[in-house]
Amino acid sequence: MLASYTWSKSIDDASNFFPSAGDPNYPQNSYDLRSERGRSNFDVAHRLSVSYVYDLPFGKGRTYLGDDGAWSKLLTGWQTSGIVTLQTGRPFTVALLRELDNSGTGISALGFGANDRPNVAGDPSLGQRSPERWFNTAAFTFPPRGSFGNAGRNILDGPGYHNVNASLVKNTALSETMNLQFRAEFFNLFNHPNFNLPDNFLGSPSFGQVTSAREPRHIQFGVKLLF
């Protein structure tokens, strides 16, 4: 078994050379780069990862049912393994769907990468979050035309990530050099919903809502002939 825990804090004024969806193309105000200082887009404060491989103690050469009977042959060679990952969410920035500061850099031609931010008053965080209302949308307002919003960069946290992947393997020796392996693999074993970032564009009909999630549970089976 292996386990690791990471606590981190990363701060910058630009996390990517090329923008991706939800990331700014340019600073909101090129003459005030200090206002861009905030948590990095990739900053994950806490991450715990545990992995294991365990040979089941049944069958020939094992603690239990080690004779040459039918049960021994059936239960010999089983192995289970898995990876458990728990982490907090990464930060995101609330942005405007339309440019109001007349700087000409508010939104990209592709419709994402908005770098104009709204005004914020009060606490935008919520004590009880849900996919329908991930943060306090009432805390954000449009700034007056011709001015920059006072909301900071990456001031909110997105959903965390909780995932368990596991496998069950049966190895059967066919000869001294040949082995038949059956595999059952489970991705997101408990079908835990891992949500994507909420809609962060003020003015969008779904502003503040989580509208998509990562992959649900997948199960796959396979047979390998190893020689």
List PLM regions with ranges.
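Short, solvent-exposed micro-motifs at the edges of structured domains
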Residues: M1-F227
